[in-house]
């Protein structure tokens, strides 16, 4: 089963390759592949937060198994503060203090942002004017083919991934699940909703005298 085989939403490990690498050029993205309903809820919230904060696509890989699954989750699991909206958007007061060029244009794509995620303005804000193009741009947004600018912009984008990884590792749950004995001869790596299936296989193999453990990864 897999894409374009008549069962397009069935789980398949190869789907991850498509999600990770289908793009034009070297671009940044975040991919979540929840293993169960709890992770789907947590990671959907986190995906919106990261997409706004770091200005990049955040993809949550749901499939038929999770969508059709019936699972009991304690109501206390959902008892949490709402996620703040529009992370990374500057207020007009903050824009007044932000960097602008000599013509008063907001430097939307500054090279020196520490975490790589440039704060942004939204249309109509005073002091937020800048240019948006589909090509590589310099700090205000004008198209630039300068090698130095290109390197600086790509370095900035790559810093996003380092910052996001640190952000995810600081979460209460890392969504990396170890299963089986702490020491084993063989290891299995699985992502997404097929995690429980692989964990069951680990139990069966160990019951037969094999030495197997597994790691489920979903972010």
Locations of regions flagged by a protein language model:
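Short beta-strand segments
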Residues: 1, 33, 59-63
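Flexible glycine/proline-rich, aromatic-decorated loop/lid segments
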Residues: 1-26
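Short gly/pro/ser/thr-enriched loop/turn and capping motifs at secondary-structure boundaries
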Residues: 2-5, 39, 67-68
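Conserved structured core elements
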Residues: 10-13, 37-41, 151, 192
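Glycine-rich, flexible loop/turn motifs
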Residues: 12-15, 28, 139, 175
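Glycine/charged-rich beta-loop-alpha catalytic/anionic-binding loops adjacent to active sites
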Residues: 24-30, 180-182
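Active-site/ligand-binding-proximal alpha/beta "capping" segment
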Residues: 27-49
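Flexible, low-complexity linker and terminal segments
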Residues: 43, 48-219
């Amino acid at each position: 089963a897999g894409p374009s085989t008549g069962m397009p939403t069935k789980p398949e490990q190869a789907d991850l390759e498509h999600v990770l690498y289908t793009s034009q050029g070297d671009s940044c993205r975040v991919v979540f592949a929840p293993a169960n309903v709890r992770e789907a809820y947590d990671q959907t919230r986190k995906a919106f937060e990261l997409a706004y904060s770091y200005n990049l696509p955040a993809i949550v890989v749901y499939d038929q198994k999770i969508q059709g699954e019936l699972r009991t989750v304690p109501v206390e699991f959902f008892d949490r503060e709402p996620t703040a909206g529009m992370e990374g958007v500057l207020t007009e007061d903050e824009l007044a203090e932000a960097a602008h060029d000599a013509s008063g244009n907001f430097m939307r794509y500054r090279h020196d942002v520490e975490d790589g995620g440039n704060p942004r303005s939204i249309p109509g804000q005073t002091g937020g004017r800048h240019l948006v193009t589909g090509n590589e741009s310099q700090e205000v947004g004008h198209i630039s083919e300068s090698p130095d600018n290109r390197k600086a912009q790509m370095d900035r984008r790559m810093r996003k991934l380092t910052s996001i990884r640190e952000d995810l590792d600081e979460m209460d749950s890392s969504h990396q699940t170890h299963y089986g004995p702490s020491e084993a001869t063989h290891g299995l790596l699985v992502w997404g909703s097929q995690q429980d299936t692989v964990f069951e296989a680990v139990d069966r193999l160990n019951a037969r005298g094999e030495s197997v453990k597994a790691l489920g990864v979903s972010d």
